[in-house]
Amino acid sequence: MKYLPFFILLFAFALPEANAQGTRLLRQPTISSESIVFVYANDLWKVSRQGGDAVRLTTDEGHESLPHFSHDENWIAFTAQYEGNTDVYIIPAEGGSPKRLTWHPGGDYVQGWTPEGEIVFRSSRESRPTQTNKMYKVSFEGGLPEALEIPRAAFGEISPDGEYIAYVPITFWDPEWRNYRGGQAMPIWIVDRKTKE
């Protein structure tokens, strides 16, 4: 009992410090002219660029990740794992019901948008037995995905004018350290979509 006042005093000083640290593990932000959408607790959240309270956009029990605003900022494409499958979904930027765009049993991971409003994603759907990823695009309305002109890509995005693709050709087995120059360094390749060079 003689230590009880000490622990009460310690707790009284530690509690405000814990609250002052704020929310942690906000991940994968995508930024528009007015808003920021990010992943927290496996859901998508949206907040004004000026700050304020964040609003939850998705509430499904699944895992949402990799949000990307469309170029007109009216839609958000994201990857979600609902009912055990990882696919591409879109949702209005103001919130609403997610719409599923891909149906392949392999994982489909959103990378961005084309200037024409198609969603770009990576998948290993055509690469058996090596599991090499390729980039695909799918219409905003849905339909069959179409492979992009590069043979393999683990991560990448199309330039805003649609003329170039910047990508990393292979996945890494371990996250890299900043300024790392060893054999696991991931080169970024840039390809002109017209000349294929």
What residue spans do the PLM features occupy?
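Beta-propeller domains with acidic blade repeats across secreted/periplasmic ectodomains
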Residues: 56-57
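A flexible loop/linker signature enriched in serine peptidases of the S9 family
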Residues: 20-21, 39-45, 60-64, 77-89, ...
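Short, ordered coil/turn segments that flank beta-strands lining enzyme active or ligand-binding pockets
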Residues: 49-52, 71-72, 93-94, 115, ...
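Bacterial Sec-dependent signal peptides at the C-terminal "C-region" and cleavage site
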Residues: 13-23
